[in-house]
Design a protein with these regions (language model features):
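Basic, helix-initiating cap at the start of DNA-binding domains
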Residues: 1-27, 31-43, 60, 71
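Residue-level detection of the helix-turn-helix DNA-binding "recognition helix"
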Residues: 39, 53-54
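Short hydrophobic/aromatic patch on the recognition helix
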Residues: 43-52
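Alpha-helical DNA-contacting segments of helix-turn-helix folds
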Residues: 56-67
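Hydrophobic alpha-helical connector segments
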Residues: 69-107
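N-terminal hydrophobic signal/anchor transmembrane helix of membrane proteins
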Residues: 88-91, 177-190
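Amphipathic alpha-helical packing segments from all-alpha helical-bundle domains
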Residues: 114-139, 147-151
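Hydrophobic/aromatic-rich alpha-helical bundle segments in the mid-to-C-terminal region
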Residues: 122, 139-182
Length: 190
């Protein structure tokens, strides 16, 4: 894949996600069709399916798992597993290009309001947990400790993200996520 086609792919995915979120917020998730999303983005419905396998995926896919796993892998191996995961997640939050706060807020609100999307969110979180755990296990951490550390960190981030999205406060998303990791770091040091 060339740089041009990679850029075009990313641009098309972003157009589809923006169009979907706009339509979901205007007319509701259930009332919005893939055809409407594609038309709003200026592409065919087949192009939609080249980028997202389902309507759910346009909300749930974020592509951060590889970046998160790489950030945890880059964290110092001498740390306790939970601390290492927190260090890696902090690095990922700093270095990964996150979508705008309002886009994240809208995506999470839409996902929280629909049982199918909530289930998909849990499945995506499990995939992220597994990616983090695999990194830790590869460096000699027991599978049990690796799964507990990754699950604890992602549970903290999930709580922080949901509370941030559902609040009326204008604090930055990154501050809320960092505060959740602070709780875990303090717990790990005790």
């Amino acid at each position: 894949m060339t740089v041009t086609s990679t850029t075009r792919t990313a641009r098309t995915r972003a157009l589809l996600q923006v169009a979907a979120l706009r339509l979901f917020s205007e007319q509701g998730y259930d009332a919005t069709t893939v055809e409407q999303i594609a038309r709003e983005a200026g592409v065919s419905h087949m192009t939609f399916f080249r980028h997202f396998p389902t309507k759910d995926a346009v909300v749930l896919d974020d592509g951060f798992d590889p970046a998160i796993a790489a950030a945890v892998a880059a964290a110092p191996t001498g740390l306790l597993p939970l601390t290492r995961v927190c260090v890696g997640l902090r690095a990922a939050l700093t270095h990964v290009d996150l979508p705008g706060q309002e886009e994240v807020r809208l995506r999470v609100r839409i996902a929280a309001e629909h049982s199918v999307l909530r289930a998909g969110t849990y499945a995506a979180t499990e995939a992220t947990q597994e990616a983090i755990a695999e990194v830790l296990v590869a460096d000699g951490v027991s599978p049990f400790e690796a799964r507990v550390a990754s699950a604890a960190a992602l549970a903290a981030l999930t709580v922080a993200l949901l509370e941030w999205c559902l609040s009326d406060e204008n604090d930055p998303m990154s501050a809320r996520l960092s505060a959740a990791l602070d709780v875990l770091d303090e717990t790990a040091r005790r």
